[in-house]
Amino acid sequence: MEIIKDALAGTLESSDVMVRIGPCDEPGIHLELESLVKQQFGNAIERVARETLAKLGVERAHVVIDDKGALECVLRARVQAAVMRAAEQTEIQWGAI
């Protein structure tokens, strides 16, 4: 899936996560992570985000994750929503998720 424009999903409320995604000139996923629990769960957060992006077919993007203690299911949903908005997709590919 090609990222066409900047988009975001989520909030900065407690137990949520804000995911910002935009196009990137360089190949690969460039991920920035800010989290209250980065020391403990930073690797897991990054792994979940990268897995979700891979399942959606995103190969090139700049992603900023600002986590406020979100559960894994919330993180996946926010990444999916941001990707759909950034790719200007209206049809959800349930098989990819």
Swiss-Prot record:
The name this protein goes by in its record: Citrate lyase acyl carrier protein
UniProt entry keywords in alphabetical sequence: Cytoplasm, Phosphoprotein
Cell compartments where the protein resides: Cytoplasm
Family to which this protein belongs: Belongs to the CitD family.
Record bears the keyword Cytoplasm: yes
Coiled-coil boundaries: none
Keyword Phosphoprotein: yes
GO cellular component terms, semicolon-separated: cytoplasm
Gene label: citD
Protein species of origin: Escherichia fergusonii (strain ATCC 35469 / DSM 13698 / CCUG 18766 / IAM 14443 / JCM 21226 / LMG 7866 / NBRC 102419 / NCTC 12128 / CDC 0568-73)
Record-linked NCBIfam families: citD, PRK13253.1
Modification sites for O-(phosphoribosyl dephospho-coenzyme A)serine: S14
Subunit structure: Oligomer with a subunit composition of (alpha,beta,gamma)6.
Role: Covalent carrier of the coenzyme of citrate lyase.
